[in-house]
Amino acid sequence: MAEKAHYERTKPHVNIGTIGHVDHGKTTLTAAITKMLADKGLAEAQDYANIDAAPEERERGITINTAHVEYETENRHYAHIDAPGHADYVKNMITGAAQMDGAILVVAATDGPMPQTREHILLAHQVGVDYIIVFLNKTDLVDDDELTDLVEMEVRELLSEYDFPGDDIPVIRGSALGALNGNPDDVKAVEELMATVDEYVPTPERDTDKPFLMPVEDVFTITGRGTVASGRIDRGQVTVGDEVEIIGLKEEIAKTTVTGLEMFRKTLDQGQAGDNIGALLRGIDRESIERGQVLAKPGSIQTHKNFKGEVYILSKDEGGRHTPFFSNYRPQFFFHTTDVTGVIELPEGVEMVMPGDNVTFTVELISPVAIEKGLKFTVREGGRTVGAGVVSEIID
């Protein structure tokens, strides 16, 4: 009997998703990818209905329907996100529990780019999805190749408009439905698509390799030993003896050394991304550190007061506001572990924002906070969530 290949859990992990206009074939393509890989023994085939009936999830108080599919190629393990409705997409990309490392933009060759195509490209740009691969779908329904060429040109121009390298982005042509039905040419196109995703979307840097960052959740004193800051390490790692900075809420940055670490009441030499730890800090008194600040590798993150955010405002049904808001609205912005009041300025030509809208606006915080592009936040009013967003640009 032939020896079975040993399953190794060593493949790098990448998050991707399908984006694009409604009915252009995102979900059919997702199903076709799983079928093609299942035939190679690398995935479980998921049928269309299965993916389309996405379960509801609550992410930061917002209800989103999202389908999570996982599969492997020869080189990688993928988590693939597909959201059925347009509103689900918008919410998912802004609040996204899963940050996409890359996206497959599905455009029907029969229609060309449509309003949601544009909106999804804009969102991908705003929330920091750096890599897009295009799948021109339904090419079997277009008689003239020149028409398909025109659609490809339009898509490339649209991508360039939002700062993606439109001329260089890989474009694959095929039919997702054909692939699902086993048509060899279309199956080949889906194989080519996944080979391209493997190659074009770089493996993301692992969280543990990034510079150390831990939002402070709690501070307490151990008599005779000093001050301990506790929290969950967001990224990177920290070792006893490391120098760290205490950043945020105050203009000045304090430097200190980690003299001890503990987790689950046991001492620890090193903490890493995902660990809930307490860090004993040398020469820091109880008053000079507070919840909402961060501990960070020196020089790795700065505080800012002004930023642009891409934000989804909850609808009334989602427990959000019942009325619109205008420029100079002053809610709280919840970053890391604390609320900071900020003043909103709407972009030119936008009079007001209605519940259920997504919008880009500028914020001036009343205290400096350790923030960077891509950081997620919630907008709150009197303790309840009225919006969720992501920092799209730092303004100094």
Swiss-Prot record:
Annotated spans, G2: 61-65
EC number: 3.6.5.3
Signal peptide: none
Family matches, as Gene3D superfamilies: P-loop containing nucleotide triphosphate hydrolases, Translation factors
GO annotations of cellular component type: cytosol
Region named G4: 137-140
Region described as G3: spans on this chain: 82-85
Region annotation G1: where it falls in the sequence: 20-27
Keywords (A to Z) from UniProt: Cytoplasm, Elongation factor, GTP-binding, Hydrolase, Magnesium, Metal-binding, Nucleotide-binding, Protein biosynthesis
InterPro entries in UniProt: EF-Tu_GTP-bd, EF-Tu_GTPase, EFTu-like_2, EFTU_2, G_TR_CS, P-loop_NTPase, Small_GTP-bd, T_Tr_GTP-bd_dom
Residues annotated for GTP binding in this entry: 20-27, 82-86, 137-140
Stretches the record annotates as G5: 175-177
Binding-site positions, Mg(2+): 27
Gene Ontology molecular functions: GTP binding; GTPase activity; translation elongation factor activity
Superkingdom per UniProt: Bacteria
Family: Belongs to the TRAFAC class translation factor GTPase superfamily. Classic translation factor GTPase family. EF-Tu/EF-1A subfamily.
Protein name: Elongation factor Tu
Organism whose genome encodes this protein: Latilactobacillus sakei subsp. sakei (strain 23K)
Taxonomic lineage from the root: Bacteria, Bacillati, Bacillota, Bacilli, Lactobacillales
